[in-house]
């Protein structure tokens, strides 16, 4: 029996800002640290399937920007077939800005970009 998986979904670059606490409305606070990583619900599912041994293909969209190139490379590094990921010349690659506090609570703001245009 073969394990073939096709995922249709979002592709984002996640940027996480680590903070001691969330700001009050109108308040500006400083992040303790910042990190970026591949993300998006669909991309995360495809990576999980591929790492579980499934032959995995992805259907989605990225922008024609450095973030899109980064995401295509990241998915390919996990042996995910990226031939069905379109490159959108008009919209940027999706992104998520994640604020994570010291208690592990988060707020997430997403820019859909090429994901929504698809």
Roles of regions detected by a PLM:
Residues 84-88, 98-118:
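Conserved phosphate-binding/catalytic loop of the ribokinase/pfkB sugar-kinase fold
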Residues 52, 91-94:
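Short, basic and Ser/Thr-rich N-terminal targeting/leader segments
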